Amino acid sequence: MSYSVGKIHKYSVDLYQSLEEETGQHVSFHKTGNLRLARNQERMDEYKRYCGTASTIGVPFEMIGPAEIKKLWPFAKVDDLVGAIYHPDDGHVAPVDVTMALLKGARANGAETYSEVEVTSMAQKPNDEWVVSTNKGDITCDVVISCTGNYARETGRMVGLELPVVPVEHQFIVTGPIPELVEYNRAGNPEMAVLRESDSSYYMRQEADGLILGPYEKGAPCWALDGVPEGFGQELLPPDLERLEPHIIAAGERVPLFETAGIKDHINGPIAYTPDGNPMVGPAWGLRNFWLSEGHSFGITAAGGSGRHLAEWIVEGSPSIDMNGVDPRRFSAAQSTRDFIKAKNEECYEHVFVIHYDFEERSAARPAKMSPIYDRQKALNAAFGQRYGWERPNWFAPEGTEPFNKYSFRTRRTNWFETVGEEVKAVRERVGLLDLTSFTKHEISGPGAEDYLNKMIANRLPTTQGGTVLGHALTASGGVESEFTITRDGDKFFAVSSGSAERHDHDVLLRTLPRDGSVSLKNITLEHGTLVVCGPRSRELLSKITDADLSNDGFPWLTSQRITVAGVSLLALRVNFVGELGWELHHPIDQQVQLFDSIVDVGEEFGLRHFGMYAMESMRLEKSYRMWGSDLTREYSILEAGLSRFVRLKKDEFVGKEALLMQKETGVPQEFVTLEIDVTDADALGSEPIFRNGEMVGRATSGCYGHSIGKSLALAYVKSGNGDIGTELEIEILGERRSAQVIPESPCDPDNLKLRA
């Protein structure tokens, strides 16, 4: 479960239980609980992983056995079950009733609503107001929020957006009255929990004296790929009972009285989906005052929380929770094509109940974006992962080993664990080569560029030619919006940021761009590749193919130079994300193959090894380096993140300064810590709860095994007062609490001697 989505759903459930009292409008909230069944230990381990996240969000749950399941669902067979996870506060509501209650509450607070209105076009005025044209006249407004369900793609195109939202057909069956349920209800028994048979991919719940069965079957097609038919409203689609047959049989085996029940209704309707199944909630990229709340495959479950946190974002400038998991800007243009959406949305639908493994890489719509050396990496037995549409090597399988992740909670240690350890060892002891072409890259130039960037980031810009700094764009509350490595390159600045943040960071840069033309912003991500050569022998290797002086005096740490490597003119930055002597080589993309081949040819002499994202992750945790999107989010301030060294509070002006000054005076509510964990076969990954003396005091944001130091590590936020070095804590991993200790940052090379070598 995504942390963002979990927070949104939690707020919705809480809201719906109080909405009727607040508005006087009945919402038909049935607090029945939610029961997820498990037929094997693998499924139970998935639930344990989920429970860790649920704890950090505040969602109550119980892990129960077959006897407790039978009490909650007396009509279910339980003899083949291992157990279940039970959410007592969950249930179901009537979407129409919730909608009416929200409307009533909005009207009571001054909102105006209009029905039977068709939007025909939208246009923005020079003063940023929007004119929304309808079949009943124009509406001029400051802000537009697009919540158009199955019409999302058409709505987006009205304002020049290609939204990766397309409906998928979803069917469910409603039975007629079932004698046993009639008798059960007459006896005054409570309504049974919503039943989810994950291993057979369906949900079931009571509907008066009958049952509803909702399968998530394979082969469910996308609908209206080329546009919703004109005039389509609440109409239903032709049912396909044959697709549901395996699920109907499975439901009858689990609940025998369903097998003999008569079908009252068979309904097939479209549900809006995105490629990852999460909604798109937040600002639309490239537009001012235009917001999205689209792709809600969870339906009414997300309405309350999405509305709340979107309102915060619009009114206060930032949501109070981490919304990266639902931010519309998480998708690239390559992930918004017709073919990509069709393949991924259908895959996402049929995987709703499939076990969600750690490090899972699904196969649909791949490859979408590749660096020019993709074929060479494939020939080297690279095991690829996809992020933001990019194919990136996660690890390189040894000869004779299939380059694919094998998934199992039971095995705990993965099939790539040893290989990644060898990649780390090679980088730490010799030299490694990493492809980070997916990095987001921008050029910022013009007479106003320096002033513009200085007001955006909390750090100072580099003052010397070739100087490089880490700079953070903050929210008004001091949370981290974006992270950039910024280099002064001649008469311009070169900014590098996360590969998954291209659309997000371009939008962040664009929103504060002066309108007087004094600053030019250019996204050069696709024009330039990035290869990283790092390790103690990286200087020796590169010196074989460049005439540049790579010595400490000639090319100090945290600087950059325009140099020629293997005949390729490029920008070299003496920085990296693994904590070793090394250089990022930012080069013209059309010369990547030439550069790569030369490095590989020369590298043989120095024991060069290709390494992937998993090895990089291990090494960056050994350095306590924060990752944007997991360790650095809007939810925690940059001071809470322990990055005060990148904040210059004496600067005249930057976004978030006032909030940080106040927090510095009052103290931070959370502290960022590095943890060493006592584990044997499973590591933290992020979102695990952290305890002290039985009380939950924080959550992990990243975790993995540190191969260089032979320790399991995690990065985490804990309540202030729990972060002193040596503090003994516990962290829950797959349902087991493991001992953890707060250790000093950067357990590998704490004095940065390797970086400065």
PLM region spans:
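Central beta-strand plus flanking loop segment that forms part of the substrate or channel wall
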Residues: 1, 34-36, 161-187, 246, ...
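Dinucleotide-binding Rossmann-like beta1-alpha1 core, especially the glycine-rich loop
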Residues: 1-72, 199-204, 208-212, 346-358, ...
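Glycine-rich phosphate/pyrophosphate-binding beta-alpha loops
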Residues: 3, 90-95, 199-201, 268-274, ...
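A non-catalytic, amphipathic alpha-helix used as a structural packing/dimerization or gating element
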Residues: 4-18, 49, 101, 243-246, ...
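Flavin (FAD/FMN) cofactor-binding and adjacent substrate-gating region
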Residues: 15-18, 22, 30, 39-109, ...
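Flavin-dependent oxidoreductases
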Residues: 121-237, 246-254, 339-361, 365-370, ...
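C-terminal catalytic lobe of FAD-dependent flavoproteins
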Residues: 199, 208, 230-369
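Glycine/proline-enriched, intrinsically flexible loops and inter-domain linkers
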Residues: 321-322, 328-757
